Every structure is written in structure tokens, then in C-alpha cells.
A protein has these predicted regions:
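Conserved hydrophobic/aromatic beta-strand scaffold that supports enzyme active sites
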Residues: 1, 11, 39-41, 106, ...
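Glycine-rich loops and low-complexity Gly/Arg-rich segments
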Residues: 7-10, 25-26, 34-38, 67, ...
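A short linear-motif detector with a strong N-terminal bias
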Residues: 18-22, 29-32, 83-84, 105-107, ...
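C-terminal beta-strand edge segments of enzyme domains
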Residues: 109-195
Length: 197
């Protein structure tokens, strides 16, 4: 994570490695990567920003931990396959935003250009989802760039040919703001699970 002045504020190693079979194709990230062992929240100009990577989005408890630690914005750079992206991408991004009362900024690599290198086509469809379920989507499927970058900026909404987008973010709607719909504060922790027979 690099702040607006170019200073490194922190780094994150993906905790959940993608070991799966999708449409007959086997992915074993653990063969070439090592999993991280902690979560990261950086303070960027007074905004608490949580870091995650791709497959991490499928683990809601990770996002809840960051929200409980004060994350207002959570970044998710990703390369979902076309199959999993079409079925799950938007649902997961919006769910993590709503259930944790945070903005989720989900950049995504685009389509066929990656297929020649990685052997699979990626879904693309970068988006920003807000705490009330609002969603700004960038439906890029034919751009020849290898990725799409989403940035948040407090006052402007503008998407230009350069694929740089500015999305309005109102941090008053996040879980750490007084007077908001306080789902995080109302949640129960440490309940025992009772098995029924």
C-alpha cells in the first residue's frame, strides 16, 4: 500500500491461496506461493484501508475482522476466472461491503490477454460497492490492457478512456461513523454451536 506521497504504508501477503478445480482446470497456488499469516489495515490520510487479494473475498470472517478493527475501505485486486466471476464476483463484492458496512474497491484483470500467460480467461468487471449496497461497475470486457484500476476520490465521478475512474465515497456511511446502521456493533461473538441429533 502506497500513500499519496509515495510512501509505503504496508504490504499484505494473501492469506487464502487459490487451490481449486474450475471446469476441469486445476489451480494450485500453494505450489508457487506461500500464504500470509496476518491481516493489514493502513491509515491513508485518516481513512482506514484494509488489504485483501482475490480468493480472500470468499472468506467473510476475514473482512469482518478488518471491519471490527476499523476498516472503512477494503481493497480487493483480483483475477477471477470467467466461470467463477460470472457466477460470484458481483455478489461477493456487494455482500462484503453490506455485511461489513465498508466500501469494497475491487479491481480486476481483464479477459483474454491473461489467457495466453496463465491459461485461463479472467472475468474483469472491476467495481466499487458501498455499505448500503450501491455499486459502481466498470463493465470492461474488450479493453486490451492487462488490468483496470479503480481509485476512490471523495468528490468526483468520472470514467475516462484511460480507465481511471473516480468514485464518490461518503465515509459517514461506514460502520465506524456515529449514527450509522451499526451491524458490526450488534453482532454476537463467541457463541457455542449446538449440534442437533
Amino acid at each position: 500500500m502506497i500513500d499519496p506521497r509515495g510512501n509505503v504504508q504496508g504490504s499484505y501477503d494473501k492469506v487464502h491461496l487459490f487451490n481449486a478445480v474450475v471446469n476441469g482446470t486445476t489451480f494450485r497456488a500453494s505450489d508457487v506461493e506461500s500464504a500470509g499469516d496476518h491481516l493489514v489495515i493502513a491509515d491513508i490520510n485518516g481513512v482506514k484501508v484494509g488489504l485483501s487479494i482475490c480468493f480472500d473475498i470468499r472468506f467473510p470472517e476475514m473482512f469482518r475482522q478488518m471491519a471490527r478493527a476499523g476498516a472503512q475501505v477494503i481493497l480487493v485486486p483480483a483475477a477471477f476466472t470467467r466461470t467463477t466471476g460470472k457466477a460470484h464476483w458481483e455478489v461477493l463484492v456487494r455482500a462484503r461491503a453490506i455485511e461489513n458496512q465498508a466500501y469494497v474497491v475491487a479491481s480486476a484483470t481483464i479477459a483474454s490477454e491473461d489467457a495466453t500467460v496463465s491459461g485461463f480467461e479472467t472475468w474483469g468487471h472491476a467495481m466499487v460497492a458501498g455499505p448500503w449496497g450501491m455499486c459502481w461497475q466498470i463493465w470492461a470486457r474488450s479493453i486490451t490492457a492487462s488490468g483496470l484500476l479503480s481509485w476512490i476520490w471523495p468528490r468526483w465521478t468520472r470514467c475516462e478512456r484511460s480507465c481511471l475512474c473516480f468514485i464518490p465515497v461518503d465515509l459517514r456511511f461506514t460502520s465506524v461513523s456515529p449514527g450509522t446502521f451499526r451491524v458490526i456493533a450488534c453482532g454476537l461473538q463467541g457463541l457455542d454451536v449446538k449440534a442437533l441429533r
